[in-house]
Amino acid sequence: MKIECMKNLIYTFVGSVTLVLLTSCSAEFENGTPEPWQREINPNENYEYTIKHPCLVNTEADFERARRKVNERAEPWISGWEKLCESRFAQLSYNANPQEEIVRHSQGGNFNTAAFDAGAAYQLAVRWKISGDEDYAKAAVRILNGWAKTCKGVNYKTWPDDSHRLLAAGFIGYQFAAPAELMRDYEGWKTEDFEVFKKWIDKTFYPICDDFLDNHFNSSAISGWMSWDLPAMLTILSIGVLNDDDAKIKQALEFFYHGKGMGCIEWSVKGMHEDPAGKVKGRHLAQSQEMGRDQGHATLNVGLHAYFCRTAYNMGIDLFAYNDNIILDLCEYTAKYNLTSAEDVEMPFEPYYHPKYGWHEKVSADSKGRARPGWELLYNHYAKVKGMNAPYSQAFAEKERPEGSGERGTAEAGDLGFGTLLYTEE
């Protein structure tokens, strides 16, 4: 008992000192000075890009490959296509339900309605891009126009001061941007309607995400989570690309490199470890900030990183390779632990102090084995495009193949998915 009390006193003291240091030291530290165990950050940070629409998570090359492989009925693309065609969100009979206000708060809200409608618009757009059937294009555009002409904001009259508005804006913003980017050249989408949509998505989602990344709603940046910063970053980047807005694109990239918060790559990683099983050779496993919180959020960050890095990559900025491919190391750690629901996986762990929730001393088994989309994108990029060893990401991609999308509500509705169809390389 005395030993345990002494341990708690030490933790409290260390945590207090850590918090004081992190909140009161120089601007250089606030901008993301790496912790001592981290590798040297690559100084060659790239802000030079070229936009060739469509270039969010999907490019025309992705669709050309998918069309060819589906027509050949080649695996695994044809299974991915059939998975899409089976989705309840990818049907012409889908009925969207635009809301005047998107609401999310601790008691619930209607944000899933927006998330599901955005997901449906994306899936319908993908069906059009691959099949050429214009009925799917018309259905996607109806959803986008309906929301742009109906919705006036996020938590703007209900719960205006609730921080859940960031989660609604962050996750739903990029979901609406993705199908709009695919439909931008569709002749059936009137220019004036597309312009209305671009103004709507900017006015509705950007200010909330911008405010959060700037001051974290007047709270300490280190008291947040990766899964708060990353969707805000992704929405800002996506709106920037959709609207050809250089300032927003550079804002999102700058936060990835140097942001004051857990979405900054320097702050996302809390430990570097050797693989006890020896499968990851010549590299390390990178422990992410939320591995000690729960696996629902830890696996959520995999997809968010995948979509953010893919969007940048499609513009010529290789964030996948940044800091010696550290995104791969993050994914390998997360995949290794979540491949099974069994709790006997040996996982090294660096204790991490969270200013609000205290010490995380081991990997959390909460929601262990959570399966989300994103693994196909990451596995194919690192293993097939770059030729790198990614054993745990590969195993997770194979486990989930053919990959669908998130359909269980809350943040999972934000998983664009269908990576087997769209990201499998030849």
Language-model region placement:
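Intrinsically disordered, low-complexity regulatory regions of eukaryotic regulatory proteins
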Residues: K2, S26-E28
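Bacterial N-terminal signal peptides that target proteins for export
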Residues: K2-V14
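Hydrophobic helical h-region of N-terminal Sec-dependent signal peptides
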Residues: G15-L19
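C-terminal motif of bacterial Sec signal peptides marking the signal peptidase cleavage site
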Residues: L21-S24
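Extracellular glycan-targeting catalytic surfaces
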Residues: E28-N218, L230, L234, E254-Y257, ...
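Short, contiguous, pocket-lining structural segments
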Residues: A168, F197-W200, S220-A232, V241-D244, ...
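Flexible, glycine-rich surface segments
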Residues: I239-I326
